[in-house]
């Protein structure tokens, strides 16, 4: 943030976010651990659970409270969960989750379901920094060992950007060259657009080469 605008940077990321879509067949303690894995970063981090079973959701909430007592960063994680954590209940995970996931556009999305429905749900999601599929794929695997970059868009930026990649460190320069024949083909379209924008000099730079008067 200090040098942003003076030089190119990767992206402005943070606070951390996780959204977990989980059915009732999960161990509540596992899901609680996933939610807290991002809550422990910062009091401003956000952890969201989408579930389709009220009893399971309540069990996860209790598991979060129990797990907090064991964390070295309990104060930070607790403040994050208290102020920014939430549980969203839906009737049908496959039918109702996608619109919520895309609206939140979280940094990390876990789909803790059997592989087939998890993959089906993931295929419908348009906005997420990274998606972790299946009950045995906690977000921390992406942080440390999976090989995917964990510098990801936050604050709903996943709606229009992706994670850090080699492309972010490349500088590209466009090169354009027109022959007289190519200009004769492309020029009229450029003239029409320049006229529509009311930019006379733009149009003249083309028409003067086409031996036309603007």
Model-derived features with residue positions:
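A glycine- and small/hydrophobic-rich beta-loop-beta segment
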Residues: 37, 41, 49-128
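Glycine-rich, charged/polar anion/phosphate-binding loops
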Residues: 3-7, 31-36, 94-96, 116-119, ...
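Conserved NAD(P)+-binding/catalytic subdomain of aldehyde/semialdehyde dehydrogenases
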Residues: 1-48
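Short acidic, glycine/serine/threonine-rich loops at helix termini
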Residues: 1, 30-33, 59-63, 145-146
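Short beta-strand-to-turn element immediately C-terminal to the catalytic PLP-Schiff-base lysine
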Residues: 21-23, 49-52, 88-91, 133-134, ...
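Generic structural signal for well-ordered, non-membrane alpha-helical segments
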Residues: 11, 24, 28, 53, ...
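C-terminal core of ALDH-fold dehydrogenases
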Residues: 99, 103-214
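Gly/Ser/Thr-rich active-site loops/lids in small-molecule metabolic enzymes
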Residues: 11-17, 43-50, 54-62, 72, ...
